[in-house]
Amino acid sequence: MKLEKDNAMDRADTLEQQNKEANIRAEKAEEEVHNLQKRMQQLENDLDQVQESLLKANTQLEEKDKALSNAEGEVAALNRRIQLLEEDLERSEERLNTATTKLAEASQAADESERMRKVLENRSLSDEERMDALENQLKEARFLAEEADRKYDEVARKLAMVEADLERAEERAETGESKFVELEEELRVVGNNLKSLEVSEEKANQREEAYKEQIKTLTNKLKAAEARAEFAERSVQKLQKEVDRLEDELVNEKEKYKSITDELDQTFSELSGY
């Protein structure tokens, strides 16, 4: 009986010891559970913050993607604009070269016209001298014609006198006839001289009119050449202004393109940081 009691006491002590150990383990387990709960709560809080940060980062990333797409579209548009400007500039340069060539041709034509004008001026002076000579010849011809008319009247008067003398003196017939023949010959010569002088005067008038018409035509050509030269010069000035304007616009577009490129580089750097 005592042995059973001792065994029971030993078992009771053992169970009590086991109970104490179990309580200690339970307390440790509860403490560990509490610590785990605190850690889980902290992890949940951290997870919420991480999810919130991730949401913000995704939102910012979407905004950056939109900005990048817009910037790429603007860059593409600017590239097209620059290409169009370069093509316009090339066409303007071609027009400028064409206008420069035309201006050179017009200048050459103007120089040639100036040379022709000087030649015509010299020729005009020569023609004026010839016209003065012709006028002098014409005056002389008119004087000769008047003199011929006077001589003709005188011959006619003398002829009448000869005819009267012929009627009155048959014995002087041979002498009178011979003189009459001489007078007729003189009259014929005078008539031919008058006709020659009239033809010379008509030709001189025709040449004078031809010279005047030629001078008028050349003067009109010179004025037309000067007008073309002035027009070409104005066209070149307008083209030069257009080229200057296009160059300024191209510089502005390049500056805008550089600014956008810098902004894109900065955006890429920020995205790389995330």
UniProtKB/Swiss-Prot annotation:
Q: Which UniProt keywords apply?
A: Allergen, Coiled coil, Repeat
A single Pfam family it belongs to is Tropomyosin
Q: Which residues form a coiled coil?
A: 1-274
Q: Where do the record's region annotations for Disordered lie?
A: 1-30
The written remark on domains in the entry is: The molecule is in a coiled coil structure that is formed by 2 polypeptide chains. The sequence exhibits a prominent seven-residues periodicity.
* Family membership: Belongs to the tropomyosin family.
Query: What is the role of this chain?
Result: Tropomyosin, in association with the troponin complex, plays a central role in the calcium dependent regulation of muscle contraction.
Can you state the subunit structure given in the record?
Homodimer.
Concerning PANTHER family, the annotation shows:
TROPOMYOSIN (PTHR19269)
Q: What is this protein called?
A: Tropomyosin
Q: Which organism is it from?
A: Panulirus stimpsoni (Chinese spiny lobster)
